[in-house]
Amino acid sequence: MKQTMYKPKRSFRRNLTPIRRHLSPIGSGDRIDYKNMSLISRFISEQGXILSGRVNRLTSKQQRLMTNAIKRARILSLLPFLYNEN
């Protein structure tokens, strides 16, 4: 007689640890705008590059709006394209 080997069934219970939602660094009253320099400066690195969405903890829509606002501010000379080390 041939015996078959059965795998034990896995239980599909999830861990009961609560999932923490990360709060957005942009408040509900803050508007993403190229004129809002205090907000924009938080999302630019020391070299002047735009920080990624993972580093910023922004949603993809917020990151897209922030990128466009930073680029507009650079074109209008409100922000430098690169920060000099000197």
Curated annotation (Swiss-Prot):
<keyword id="KW-0689">Ribosomal protein</keyword>
<dbReference type="GO" id="GO:0006412">
    <property type="term" value="P:translation"/>
</dbReference>
<dbReference type="InterPro" id="IPR036870">
    <property type="entry name" value="Ribosomal_bS18_sf"/>
</dbReference>
<keyword id="KW-0934">Plastid</keyword>
<dbReference type="GO" id="GO:0070181">
    <property type="term" value="F:small ribosomal subunit rRNA binding"/>
</dbReference>
<keyword id="KW-0150">Chloroplast</keyword>
<dbReference type="Pfam" id="PF01084">
    <property type="entry name" value="Ribosomal_S18"/>
</dbReference>
<keyword id="KW-0687">Ribonucleoprotein</keyword>
<comment type="subunit">
    <text>Part of the 30S ribosomal subunit.</text>
</comment>
<comment type="similarity">
    <text>Belongs to the bacterial ribosomal protein bS18 family.</text>
</comment>
<keyword id="KW-0694">RNA-binding</keyword>
<dbReference type="GO" id="GO:0005763">
    <property type="term" value="C:mitochondrial small ribosomal subunit"/>
</dbReference>
<keyword id="KW-0699">rRNA-binding</keyword>
<dbReference type="InterPro" id="IPR001648">
    <property type="entry name" value="Ribosomal_bS18"/>
</dbReference>
<dbReference type="GO" id="GO:0003735">
    <property type="term" value="F:structural constituent of ribosome"/>
</dbReference>
<protein>
    <recommendedName>
        <fullName>Small ribosomal subunit protein bS18c</fullName>
    </recommendedName>
</protein>
<dbReference type="GO" id="GO:0009507">
    <property type="term" value="C:chloroplast"/>
</dbReference>
